[in-house]
From Swiss-Prot:
Alphabetic keyword roster: Activator, Cytoplasm, DNA-binding, Transcription, Transcription regulation
GO terms of molecular function: DNA binding; nucleic acid binding
Organism (species): Bacillus cereus (strain ATCC 14579 / DSM 31 / CCUG 7414 / JCM 2152 / NBRC 15305 / NCIMB 9373 / NCTC 2599 / NRRL B-3711)
A single GO BP: regulation of gene expression
SMART domains (UniProt xref): CSP
Assembly and interaction partners: Homodimer.
Source species, domain of life: Bacteria
UniProt name for this protein: Cold shock-like protein CspC
Localization in the cell: Cytoplasm
UniProt domain CSD: residue ranges: 3-62
InterPro entries referenced in this protein's UniProt entry, alphabetically: Cold_shock_CspA, Cold_shock_domain, CSD, CSD_CS, CSP_DNA-bd, NA-bd_OB-fold
PANTHER family: COLD SHOCK DOMAIN CONTAINING PROTEINS (PTHR11544)
Length: 65
């Protein structure tokens, strides 16, 4: 699934991804697939999976496009 980063707070390590076909999805820095400092930029296109988290759907396996 693809979407766009709505916002991401690097200090707190989380944010939201705007899906092309649905509701926004929570994203935690631990779901970002990259080495080193894991962060996302507002407006950045990403690809991701959706999994059921403790508080509802959240992004997993997030890859920057």
């Amino acid at each position: 699934m693809q979407g766009r980063v709505k916002w991401f707070n690097a200090e707190k390590g989380f944010g939201f991804i705007e899906r092309e076909d649905g509701d926004d999805v929570f994203v935690h820095f631990s779901a970002i697939q990259q080495d080193g400092y894991k962060s996302l930029e507002e407006g950045q296109q990403v690809e991701f999976d959706i999994v059921d988290g403790a508080r509802g759907p959240q992004a997993a396996n997030v890859v920057k496009l």
